[in-house]
Design a protein with these regions (language model features):
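Glycine-/charge-enriched secondary-structure boundary and capping motifs
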Residues: 17-20, 27-153
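Short, acidic (Asp/Glu-rich) active-site segment that either coordinates a divalent metal cofactor
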Residues: 1-20
Length: 153
């Protein structure tokens, strides 16, 4: 199986360093139980683990499914393509943010606010793509490649 991180490394022809991908079963269990608790308390609208493709791919998938862009402030490639286990993207009603932060501290679960879901662009710091373009790539890349190959014959 090719991971997003391995593919990124291959495409850039340079190793992505300082990425620690370890499986910690206790952390997996704690964070998974925390997510279930958040759903039970109706504190989050959705949750998606980032272990397959990292944060960048997860955010793109969520944007496509919800037809809604996002703005995140982090710009680190390593951060966005790290496929470390036991991490989740959650969406919440902004009115519940303080309650979520308080509960995460109480349960000793690390929490990072990535940004906000809004607009029609996928913004990673100063870099952005239009949601329409990403949506087209996601849904049509294979058929476009096949059409392109057929046109060469």
């Amino acid at each position: 199986k090719t991971t997003a991180l391995a593919l990124l490394t291959e495409l850039s022809q340079a190793p992505i360093e300082n990425i620690n991908i370890k499986v910690n079963l206790e952390e997996e269990k704690r964070n998974g139980q925390f997510i279930l608790h958040l759903f039970g308390e109706k504190l989050i609208s959705s949750a998606h683990d980032v272990s397959d493709g990292g944060i960048a791919l997860t955010l793109c998938e969520l944007a496509i499914v919800n037809d809604l862009g996002f703005m995140v402030t982090e710009e680190s490639t390593e951060y966005f393509f790290n496929e470390t286990q036991a991490r989740y993207i959650v969406t919440i009603n902004p009115l519940k943010e303080k309650q979520l932060i308080s509960l995460a501290k109480e349960k000793e679960v690390p929490l990072t606010k990535l940004g906000v879901a809004k607009g029609t662009n996928l913004c990673f710091g100063q870099n952005f793509l239009s949601l329409a373009h990403v949506n087209d790539l996601y849904h049509n890349v294979i058929s476009n490649m096949m059409d392109s190959k057929n046109n060469l014959n």
